[in-house]
């Protein structure tokens, strides 16, 4: 999208409910942004986005709910995937599959299959496996843990280019920051191996184009509204004393500035249903196979 520089790093967190996606997001953000609790019901019910300025980079972290919760309908799942695509536009630098060290299920395989089904095999070139509960390794190295893991888990790791790391989301702040450093370095290395650019495909390019078009239309509309409002104020005060005119113009300008601050969100709202329909078309073909 317009206005986004090379310093932005967009990260999507995916995985099974309870694997620690929100806790991992909070570690990356350096603050408690998302609720993260050990409970029977998922804390994250909808796709969420948050930002952090970190060592000259603008991190965009997208936290997602468990997409394979059996109670969810296809409509709800389409909505969440659509939000994920919208929040990570024009494309993610990293898709992080969050796993627990002590728990690997069929849902992780389905998540990878879903990503391939939606975005193609090329998306796997941007995937990283992130294990939570690093503290449970104790004296064992992560490499040894992976080498001793079962065939299914190693198959997933291989599909993701054998890119993996582990987080202890309860660690002291300095250790958490070291983990973030490790993740960003792994992401940058992966992006460099992929030609130096973030992941993009037909869906992302289409949506980014529509968002940019919508942004320009909104800017033009808001500028016209401001001009019309100032002209109205000028006419109203033409036959009156100047007192109050300046305040009216300042108010109109502030209203215009507020609209510009919310420009991105307004554009996203405008194109959301288009994204939803595109995702629904693809997901309807995968639904019976994966759910």
From Swiss-Prot:
Binding site for GTP: 17-23, 37, 133-135, 169
Region annotated G3, chain positions: 63-66
Region G1, annotated ranges: 15-22
Residue ranges of domain AIG1-type G in the record: 6-208
Chain residue ranges for the region called G2: 42-46
UniProt note on tissues of expression: Expressed in thymus (in thymocytes), spleen (in splenocytes), lymph node and lung.
UniProt-listed Gene3D superfamilies: P-loop containing nucleotide triphosphate hydrolases (3.40.50.300)
Keyword GTP-binding: yes
Region (G5): 168-170
Region listing for G4, in residue ranges: 132-135
Keyword NADP assigned: no
Keyword annotations from UniProtKB, A to Z: GTP-binding, Nucleotide-binding
SUPFAM superfamilies from the UniProt entry: P-loop containing nucleoside triphosphate hydrolases
Any GO molecular function: GTP binding
Family: Belongs to the TRAFAC class TrmE-Era-EngA-EngB-Septin-like GTPase superfamily. AIG1/Toc34/Toc159-like paraseptin GTPase family. IAN subfamily.
Name of the molecule in the record: GTPase IMAP family member 9
Gene transcribed to yield this protein: Gimap9
């Amino acid at each position: 999208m317009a206005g986004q520089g090379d310093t932005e790093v967009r990260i999507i967190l995916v995985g099974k409910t309870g694997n620690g996606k929100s806790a991992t997001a909070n570690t990356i953000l350096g603050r408690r942004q998302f609720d993260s609790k050990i409970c029977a019901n998922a804390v994250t019910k909808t796709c969420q986005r948050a930002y952090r300025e970190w060592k000259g980079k603008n991190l965009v972290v997208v936290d997602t709910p468990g997409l394979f919760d059996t109670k969810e309908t296809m409509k709800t799942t389409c909505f969440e995937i659509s939000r994920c695509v919208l929040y990570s536009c024009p494309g993610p630098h990293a898709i992080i599959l969050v796993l627990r060290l002590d728990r690997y299920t069929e849902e992780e395989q389905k998540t990878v299959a879903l990503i391939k089904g939606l975005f193609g095999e090329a998306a796997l070139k941007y995937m990283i496996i992130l294990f939570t509960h690093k503290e449970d390794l104790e004296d064992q190295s992560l490499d040894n843990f992976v080498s001793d893991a079962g065939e299914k888990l190693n198959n997933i790791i291989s599909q993701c280019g054998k890119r993996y790391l582990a987080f202890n989301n309860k660690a002291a702040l300095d250790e958490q920051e070291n983990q973030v450093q490790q993740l960003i370095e792994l992401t940058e290395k992966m992006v460099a191996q992929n030609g130096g650019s973030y992941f993009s495909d037909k869906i992302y390019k289409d949506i980014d184009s529509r968002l940019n078009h919508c942004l320009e239309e909104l800017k033009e509309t808001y500028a016209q509204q401001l001009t019309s409002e100032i002209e109205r104020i000028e006419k109203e005060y033409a036959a009156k004393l100047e007192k109050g005119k300046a305040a009216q113009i300042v108010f109109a300008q502030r209203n215009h500035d507020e609209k510009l601050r919310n420009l991105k969100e307004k554009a996203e709202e405008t194109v959301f249903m288009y994204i939803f329909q595109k995702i629904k078309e693809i997901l309807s073909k995968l639904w019976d196979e994966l759910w």
